[in-house]
Amino acid sequence: MKFVSWNVNGLRACVGKGFEEIFKSLDADFFCLQETKLQPHQITLDTPGYHQFWCSAEKKGYSGTAIFARREPLSVTYGIGIPELDTEGRLITLEYENFYLVTCYTPNSQQELARLPHRLTWDEAFRNYLSALDKSK
């Protein structure tokens, strides 16, 4: 299996710079994107043969993740399961028979560590989330 993970820093701008051609040329089984900065209805991508999964931030034009998967998953989870951490579209989990695929856009602590408490809360919750997934497969 071939996995690709790419922080696109704004998918609309990336599409204007040849994203679809790159996507097709990489021929990945799973293509994970971080920092999409859009709502799924704001873009149409030509990705035949892929299932698309989007997790967008409530705040428009901010963060967001997506996964394009050739194989349909058994289940899909959006977010980490903690409401105060799940408004920024930072995590998608696809479940398959023998594994989970998780794409994550981790929060930045920002200038002068303004969001450090949020980041530390996220880091602990993410570790716990991954640990729980690990125990289930």
Name the predicted role of every residue range:
Residues 1-46, 57, 62, 78:
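N-terminal, active-site-proximal structural segment of metallo-dependent hydrolase catalytic domains
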Residues 5, 18-21, 27-30, 81, ...:
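Glycosyltransferase catalytic domains, chiefly GT-A lineage
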Residues 116-137:
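A long, amphipathic alpha-helix that forms part
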Residues 37, 42-114:
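Structured beta-strand-rich core segments of catalytic domains in phosphoester-bond hydrolases
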Residues 26, 71, 97, 136-137:
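Structured helix-beta-strand junction loops
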